[in-house]
Amino acid sequence: MAGAFAFAQSLPVAITFNGQPLEVGGARTLADALDASGFDPRPGDLVAVDGSVLEAGKGEPFHAAVNGQVVSDLNRTLANGDVVEMGDGSPTEEPSDIVEEAIPYTISSEGGGAIHLLEGQGADGLRQIKTGRISGIVAEATVREPQNVTRRNVSPDVGDEKVVALTFDDGPWHDTTVEVLDVLRDHGAKATFFTVGSRIEGEGIDLVKRAASEGHQICTHTYTHASGSGKGVNLGFMAPDEQTAEIEQGFAAIENAIGGEASHIIRTPGGNYGDEVMRAIGPKVSAEIGWDIDSQDWRRPGSAAIANQIKSAWPGAIILMHDGGGDRSQTVEALKDALPYLKEQGYRFVTIDELMSYPLA
């Protein structure tokens, strides 16, 4: 029995070597197959991190696969029916020290409209910097390209429809918001309120509830109007986590008041929506809203001057006003003058959501 087994072990095996049938005797290893085939693989080179040759023939001695599995041991035993593919060795890169660093994604801007949309994933890429331990050569390679962002500044194409969007910032504000809501109700006008979240408490909750129940859109203008490190005007002065908190807390204040999900359309304090702000809060918002017409009511130039700004509206325009931040009695009086005038011209007053339902370009 033992003799028969030994005899069987000494028989050659039939394999396929680089597409050709081949009998392999001896120990029936990959080395034996290489000898029997007459194939003489050329070893690869030892190369630097930049691909230049350091030593010819000092790389991978050969490249082989048995039945599709890569093999580097010439003592691998073969069996009948094995399929062997063998070729020249590949270059071997010198050992190196590796440092990885992010490639920041970029934000480009196109268009001049007051509705600001972000397109793109906004993900950093990855760069690898290798320093060869033998050569001392430094080589850089991009492992992952950044996924850049485009800020599209668009306007609604309202065609022949005379629609405008009235927007109010910095409320809710005790008497003023009530008066603004009364004027809007009296003229069948809808508006969008960009609220300061910290003011949505007590009476502020009731005012937001009333505005929502009367068909107005409630959006955030941040939680504190970027107070503190934002100096009350620019989220970009704040750390990214502070910016995110301003938006998330603003959403939460609205949701607490209305009992439903807050709109993710926002307006930043001062309309400051630069790259550093877009990077921090862009993923959390669906659109940032600027304005086409600044009523200048924050300057308190008189109700007539404010009314004239409002009356200058054109189809699709977004008008900036304030129901909070101080005495807005001039704004209330201006609305009483301007809204009837615009209605006589055939205008309707819509929310930002309604305005954005038109084609945007």
Name every feature range the model reports, one short phrase each.
Residues 1-102:
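Ubiquitin-like/PB1-type beta-grasp interaction modules and other compact soluble beta-rich domains
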Residues 14-16, 83-87, 165-167, 192, ...:
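Soluble periplasmic/extracytoplasmic beta-strand elements of cell-envelope proteins
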Residues 35, 185, 212, 282, ...:
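Anion (oxyanion) recognition and catalysis
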Residues 39, 189, 216, 286, ...:
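Short phosphate-binding/catalytic loops that engage adenosine nucleotides
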Residues 54-56, 73-74, 79-165, 174-178, ...:
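N-terminal pre-catalytic segment of deacetylase/amide-hydrolase enzymes
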Residues 69, 83, 89-91, 198, ...:
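Solvent-exposed coil/turn segments that connect beta secondary-structure elements
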Residues 134-235, 246-249, 253, 257, ...:
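Active-site beta->alpha N-cap acidic-glycine motif
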Residues 179, 201-206, 225-348, 353-361:
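Catalytic domains of cell-wall/extracellular-matrix polysaccharide-remodeling enzymes
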